[in-house]
């Protein structure tokens, strides 16, 4: 007797197939093969800074912010992955935004969490969040948290540029949630707090009487601590990173790294959905893999990251992404510093994060 193929063993009668179809039902062995394929084709990818720079310069020449439609008054070039055409990954959005001298990117707020990592900044370039002006110096990281008013004001004489990083793909696509969004009635929100206010509420020294609101802002509920507006000075971050390199042993996979913490808790992740770290690499790292997405911005230096059979050769200001479950390691040419971005907190929230060496 000839051995039957699995498909023949699972073959249903025409009547059974019709019955299931009429009632919008499918057998498990047919639907399970469709799971996990929604974002098929997600690849390791890299965007070179010279290409990004040329693109944002061209957009700046062609499109004044004031000409953009309400709600989209942000001049941004968005890296899109080959296998996912809206963003760098299915959970993390990265964009490069510019504001010309004298321009304002008008105040708005949204349900997605966001941060700004300054590429070209100055004392006269400010992001205003929840009433405080935060100066945007090179490599400073500024949070613009969920449902907080924020606008970007360039009172200097040079174009400013920075990374926008949001959890928009996770919220809008993976979770299929509504994009809760609101424009402020003014282009520039009123500055109601002196510089340093939010640091005084959440920095090393805090008010004796804790009167700040700990609740999640806006029409949202949950169990995670809300992330406040905050500016992480690159001067302080780099100093601490150097201290680590002088006194500690490097992680075999990530080198010397510092996690940006939620100022309200003093612990990572910075947001419930995304975690960020500054990584100092001085030598080749050991290969590993994990089920979270890793995206990177090169702050200083050059080198290569090996992802499976691909080699991503990077230099200062390049952006690259590593898909889940791909074996990878970094190989800097001398010393390099990276900004690492990951959706690992999402997996950890479900006790589902996994990491291993090959």
Swiss-Prot record:
Domain Cupin type-1, residue spans: 239-358
Temperature dependency: Optimum temperature is 45 degrees Celsius.
Catalysed conversion reaction: 2,5-dihydroxybenzoate + O2 = 3-maleylpyruvate + H(+)
Presence of keyword Methyltransferase: no
pH dependence per the entry: Optimum pH is 7.2.
EC number of the protein: 1.13.11.4
Induction, per UniProt: Up-regulated in cells grown on benzoic acid, 3-hydroxybenzoic acid, phenylpropionic acid or cinnamic acid, but not in cell grown on pyruvic acid.
Any one biological process term the GO annotation gives: catabolic process
Record-annotated disulphide pairs: none
Catalytic EC class: oxidoreductase
GO molecular function: gentisate 1,2-dioxygenase activity
Pathway membership, UniProt: Aromatic compound metabolism; naphthalene degradation
Keywords (A to Z) from UniProt: Aromatic hydrocarbons catabolism, Dioxygenase, Oxidoreductase
Subunit structure: Homotetramer.
Function: Catalyzes the oxygen-dependent ring fission of gentisate between the carboxyl and proximal hydroxyl groups at positions 1 and 2 of the aromatic ring to form maleylpyruvate. No activity with cathechol and protecatechuate as substrates. Part of a 3-hydroxybenzoic acid-degradation pathway.
UniProt-recorded name of the protein: Gentisate 1,2-dioxygenase
Organism encoding this protein: Haloferax sp
């Amino acid at each position: 007797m000839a051995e039957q193929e699995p498909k023949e063993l699972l073959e249903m009668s025409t009547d059974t197939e019709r019955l299931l179809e009429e009632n919008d039902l499918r057998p498990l062995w047919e639907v399970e093969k469709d799971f996990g394929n929604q974002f098929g084709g997600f690849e390791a990818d890299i965007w070179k800074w010279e290409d990004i720079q040329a693109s944002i310069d061209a957009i700046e020449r062609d499109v004044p912010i004031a000409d953009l439609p309400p709600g989209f008054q942000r001049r941004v070039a968005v890296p899109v992955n080959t296998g996912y055409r809206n963003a760098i990954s299915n959970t993390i959005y990265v964009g490069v935004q510019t504001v010309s001298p004298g321009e304002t990117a008008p105040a708005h707020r949204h349900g997605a969490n966001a941060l700004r990592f300054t590429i070209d900044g100055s004392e006269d370039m400010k992001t205003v969040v929840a009433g405080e002006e935060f100066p945007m110096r090179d490599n400073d990281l500024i949070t613009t948290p969920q449902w907080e008013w924020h606008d970007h004001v360039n009172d200097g004489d040079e174009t400013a540029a920075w990374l926008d990083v949001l959890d928009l793909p996770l919220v809008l696509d993976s979770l299929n949630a509504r994009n809760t969004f609101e424009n402020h009635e003014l282009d520039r929100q009123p500055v109601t707090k002196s510089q340093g206010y939010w640091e005084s509420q959440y920095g090393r020294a805090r008010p004796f009487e804790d009167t700040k609101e700990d609740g999640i802002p806006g029409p949202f509920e949950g169990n995670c601590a809300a992330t406040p507006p905050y500016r992480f000075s690159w001067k302080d971050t780099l100093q601490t990173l150097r201290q680590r390199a002088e006194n500690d042993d490097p992680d075999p996979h990530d080198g010397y790294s510092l996690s940006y913490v939620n100022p309200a808790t003093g612990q990572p992740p910075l947001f419930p959905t995304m975690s960020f770290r500054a990584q100092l690499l001085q030598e080749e790292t050991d290969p590993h893999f994990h089920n979270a997405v890793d995206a990177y911005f090169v702050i200083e230096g050059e080198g290569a990251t090996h992802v499976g059979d691909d080699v991503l050769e990077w230099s200062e200001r390049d952006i690259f992404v590593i898909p889940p479950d791909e074996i990878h390691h970094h190989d800097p040419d001398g010393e390099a510093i990276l900004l690492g971005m990951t959706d690992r907190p999402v997996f950890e929230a479900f006790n589902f994060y996994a990491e291993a060496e090959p």
